[in-house]
Amino acid sequence: MSARVAVSQPVLSWALQRSERTFEEALTKFSKLGDWMDGSGQPTLHDLEKFAAYTHTSLGALIMPEPPDEALPIADMRTRESAAIERPSGNLLDTIDRYQQFQDWYHDYALEQGAEKLPFLGSASAQDSPRVIARRVRSLLQLDHVSATGTQQWRHDIVAALEGVGVLVMRSGVVGASNTRKLSTREFRGFSLYDDIAPLIFVNVADEPYSAQNFTLLHEFAHLLLGHSALSGGDRLLGGAGEEAWCNRVAACVLLPDEALTAFDDATTVLDYRAVARRFGVSAEVAL
């Protein structure tokens, strides 16, 4: 007879939550899940191994009496309807961990190649004028020389400019290479990982238009200018408070400097605004 393993309902619920699986979905794969949850039955070790793989959790975590405290390793700047977003998903945590490991490796590699601290990192303060900082960013990234006329080309040129000054830029809509683990833009739009040698920006591209990706790239770059790692996103592209609002303003001013605003003078409808906004790689929301 197969050995049974004691599991707790809070841990099973936590595993489902972090993997964004519902009880009903899991029940189609594990017919005795209800028994495990109410304590009237226990899974075999093989059952639990399959459940761990299904929920993308470790077997060790599933046999603990209480769920582990999985705190975000970087500052959480996200809000939804003006409230903080409480518990991160396993997809988000695993994505941050994946790129932290890559950043650590690249940091050591870059040092071996003689890399030094990038001078623009930590060079700004949230008390600085967003317009002033935006002008510095446009100069640093040489965006005044960009001839893009559409949001996709702007995305290409912004990524190239960031990489050109030493920023690692990563984009994906899934966890690693797993197409079954899709990232949610409702949960986050991107994050920045500060490092003197190997600063990194990650953009969640799952179902995100290029205009939103452009904004996120520059928003996260603004966090690096402040010298911080940060997780950004939620239910609004614009808005927020404190540092997040400052980074939003910088990103908007980089994409739409004062001299570009005259291009909207003849726009009279939303369609007009959208057409002009695309020329500058932004959404109508940012333009308005």
Where do the protein language model's features map onto the residues?
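Short juxta-domain linker segments that transition from a proline/glycine-rich
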Residues: 1-288
